[in-house]
């Protein structure tokens, strides 16, 4: 059973680099307050680290 995490966009990416905005889009986050649930993989963790100052992460019980 894979561990799931919920990623929520809590800060606007306006004024931050284009790379960080692309990472947010690839995570599936568009608008402030939007949330997505992903498997906790190393690639997702790397994307979260790139924009950690813009998102909130929490574990989801499956």
From Swiss-Prot:
Membrane-traversing stretches: none
SUPFAM superfamilies xrefs: Ribosomal protein L30p/L7e
Biological process annotations from GO: translation
Gene Ontology cellular-component terms listed: cytosolic large ribosomal subunit
Keywords attached to this entry: Ribonucleoprotein, Ribosomal protein
Gene Ontology terms, MF aspect: structural constituent of ribosome
S-S pairs: none
Domain of life, per lineage: Bacteria
Cited InterPro entries: Ribo_uL30_ferredoxin-like_sf (IPR036919), Ribosomal_uL30_bac-type (IPR005996), Ribosomal_uL30_ferredoxin-like (IPR016082)
Pfam families for the chain: Ribosomal_L30
Entry's family note: Belongs to the universal ribosomal protein uL30 family.
Matches recorded under HAMAP family: Ribosomal_uL30_B
Subunit organization: Part of the 50S ribosomal subunit.
UniProt-recorded name of the protein: Large ribosomal subunit protein uL30
């Amino acid at each position: 059973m894979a561990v799931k995490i919920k990623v929520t966009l809590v800060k606007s990416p306006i004024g931050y680099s284009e790379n960080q905005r692309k990472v947010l889009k690839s995570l599936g986050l568009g608008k402030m307050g939007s949330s997505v649930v992903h498997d906790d993989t190393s690639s997702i963790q790397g994307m979260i680290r790139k924009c950690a100052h813009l998102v909130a992460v929490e574990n989801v019980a499956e």
